[in-house]
Every structure is written in C-alpha cells, then in structure tokens.
UniProtKB/Swiss-Prot annotation:
The gene is metX. GO terms for cellular component: cytoplasm. It catalyses: succinyl-CoA + L-serine = O-succinyl-L-serine + CoA. This is Serine O-succinyltransferase. It is an enzyme of class 2 (transferase). Keywords: Acyltransferase, Amino-acid biosynthesis, Cysteine biosynthesis, Cytoplasm, Transferase. Pathway: Amino-acid biosynthesis; L-cysteine biosynthesis; L-cysteine from L-serine: step 1/2. Its EC number is 2.3.1.-. One of its GO terms (biological process) is cysteine biosynthetic process from serine. Its main location: cytoplasm. The active site is at S149, D345, H378.
Length: 399
C-alpha cells in the first residue's frame, strides 16, 4: 500500500481525538492541502475547493510545485478562479491516499497500516476535516466554497454542519444524495476490487496487488464519467490496427476498448484500493434528507439558527423523498449559490444540480442553476473549460 503525495503538499493536524459521524475516532490524523494567491489582511478573500474521489490537493501549479494540476485551466492568475484576487485553498479528502490520513496511513496506536481497521468514513467526516483546515488558517468565513463531484456532496455537508462558514457556494456536478444508479455502479466497482484474490481482505502489497480488480473498477468508472454521445463522436466503431489488436479471440478489438484499457492501467497503481473502497462507500451513504426529522438540529451536530423551524418531510416509511432532500437543502443558510451540471451526466444527473439550486433557494439563498450542453458527461467540469469556465468566472465576479 502506498500514499501518493505531490511535492509541496502542506499538512494540518486535526484535533485528536477526531470524532467521526458513524462512531469511529481518529488519533493524530492530518489533512493535506495546498494554497494559491495571498490572503487579504481582513481574510475576506478565501476560496475553498473540495474535490472528487480521486484528485489530490494539487489543483494547479504554484510556487511549491510548478507541475500542472488537475484543474490547471480553472485556477490561477486571470483564470476563472483568479488567484490574483482570491486566496485559494484545495483540501485533499480525509480517507484519501494523497496526503490526508486514510486506510493507507499508519495507525499510530499499532504502528501498522490501518487497512480495513480504518473507521467507517462519511462525507460528513470529510467536510468536518476541511472545515478544521479553514479555521486553522484563521478564516472566519470563506468568500466562496466550491465543490465538484463528490466534493459537491462534501460542500453541502460542510455548509449544513458549519453554518456561516461561507458567503457563497458553487456546486459543480454534485448532489445532495446518492441515487440508486450511482450506488449500483459504485457497488460493482467495490465488488470488482474485493473479488480480486490479491485484495486479500485488504492485506495486499506492491508485489501482490489487486490490479485486475482496480482495472475493472476504473473502467466501470470511466464509462459513467463520460457520455454515449462522446463515445460515439470520439470512437464510433473504429477498430484497432492489426498490429494493435490482440491475438486473443476475445481481446481488444475496438478503439474504445483500447482507450478504457489504457486509462485503467494508468490509474491502478496511483490510487490505493482500500482508500477507493472507503471513499466510494462514503458517497453511497450521503443523504441530506437524514437531517430532516423530529430531532432538533443541535442533536445532529448542527448549530444552525432557524434550522428547526423547517418542517419534517420524511415519508411514512422513513425513506427519503424529493421533498425530504429539498427540506434538507433548505436548512443550509448561504447568501448566493450556483449549481452547474452537464446535461449528458449519467452519474450525477443534471436534475440533481437543479434540485440543489431549488433547495438552497427555499432556504432564502439567491441560487441559480445552469445546465450546460456539454457532450462529456460527468467529467465535463475537468475538460470542458470553454463551458464551465465562464459560468464560474461570472459568479465569482459578483462575490
């Protein structure tokens, strides 16, 4: 098991013990982060980015690490998230293998890797850890909180559990709860990893590594990150050249198969399998409707003035419904918000971003929804900067 930590990573020590939502406790845990730009004297220009499942904190090149980051086109001087104006912080998720404490880290109590002894991880834990970084930097209130994909979930949890932490919010291809389709896909990804004999109940190493399981999990993910429209336009039914195709009668034959294989092989050794399992499951568990019931907000760890005045909206069976999710979102207090998505996203359908805007608006936010006609599905925010960039830039100019 390996941690994959970029050059220039900064660390924040979490409170010890760090209490987790599902009952676990971490001791001597830390969170990795990076920064760009300069913090204003009154600390009013801070922007926090919380990420999807796999990215590290290196969103863009900076003085400590000049290598391009995973959101290079979006973060930097003169870019949509303009570091000439904003002090930008990007936090690596708790539970990851990119610098923050997770299953691939050493348990200080035993001196051995956590592996599957790592406590149950929730999106709320990821949010609480990120909030602690903000407080440690002396930032009373963020100018804007930006979350994409899983980070959209993290951002909503952060806003709900830490009222007043941000003046505005951009939610990009995020959701207020995991839908059955995305849960089903992630369950298959986890099953592929766990069925690999080299996974060995989480006890693998570099020589006996669940490469086949990770490769299959990544292929399933990539299929859902893009859209059928893009697959058709990019690959069609084009076959590999004879020298590229395999002798195996059921081997790679089409270009799209080769693309998936190459993408998967590049990923499998750069993300820890156990971390993948934990973060994946945390997304399935997330549901803002949990915060709408007969309990006072204080009993749920929420210090939100007026949150208890909102009506309960659980169905008679206790199963969350669209109205419960909206009621959960309406408990969030934020001045301005923007929810953006791609109309071709099948993993976090654009209706979920529209729901976020509707729910935040019900909580008196000036909230706007934008559905973009990008062919690139869920991953559009990582590649379709011509569409996503202007929307983010325009919103931040009003902050």
């Amino acid at each position: 098991m390996t941690e994959f930590i970029p050059l220039g990573t900064l660390y924040h020590a979490l409170p010890s013990p760090f209490q987790m939502k599902r009952g676990g406790v971490l001791h001597q845990a830390h969170v990795a982060y990076e920064t760009w730009g300069a913090l204003a004297a009154d600390r009013s220009n801070a922007v926090l980015i919380v990420t999807g499942l796999s990215p590290n904190a290196h969103a863009a090149a900076n003085q400590a690490n000049p290598e391009p980051g995973w959101w290079e086109a979006m973060v930097g001087p003169g870019k949509p998230i303009d570091t000439a104006r904003w002090f930008v912080v990007c936090v690596n998720s708790l539970g990851s293998c990119k610098g923050s404490t997770g299953p691939a880290s050493v348990n200080p109590a035993t001196g051995a890797l956590y592996r599957l002894t790592f406590p149950d991880l929730s999106i709320e834990d990821v949010a609480d850890a990120a909030a602690d970084v903000v407080r440690a930097l002396g930032i009373a209130q963020l100018a804007c909180l930006i979350g994409n994909s899983m980070g959209g979930m993290t951002a909503l949890a952060l806003l709900l559990r830490h009222p007043g932490i941000a003046r505005s919010h951009i939610n990009i291809s995020g959701s207020a709860q995991a839908l059955p389709f995305s849960i089903a896909i992630r369950s298959l990804q986890r099953e592929a990893i766990r069925l690999d004999p080299h996974w060995n109940g989480g006890h693998y190493d570099d020589t006996r590594y669940p490469e086949s399981g990770m490769r299959m999990a990544r292929k399933l993910g990539v299929i859902t990150y893009r859209s059928a429209l893009e697959w058709d336009g990019r690959f069609g039914r084009v076959r590999l050249d004879s020298e590229q195709s395999e002798d195996d009668p059921f081997g790679l034959e089409f270009q799209v198969e080769s693309y998936l294989e190459g993408h998967a092989r590049r990923f499998v050794r750069f993300f820890d399998p156990n971390c993948y399992l934990y973060l994946s499951r945390s997304m399935d568990w997330f549901d803002l409707a949990e915060y709408v019931d007969d309990k006072p907000a204080a009993d749920m760890g929420i210090d939100s003035p007026g949150a208890d005045a909102l009506p309960a909206a659980k169905s008679e069976t206790g199963v969350s419904t669209a109205s419960t999710v909206l009621a959960g979102l309406a408990r969030i207090r934020i001045a301005r918000a923007l929810a953006i998505g791609a109309n071709t996203d099948i993993l976090f359908p654009v209706q979920q971003q529209e729901q976020i805007a509707d729910g935040l608006r019900a909580g008196d936010a000036d909230a706007r929804f934008i559905g973009l006609d990008s062919p690139q599905g869920h991953d559009a925010f990582l590649v379709d900067f011509a569409r996503f960039g202007p929307a983010v830039r325009d919103f931040l100019q009003g902050c």
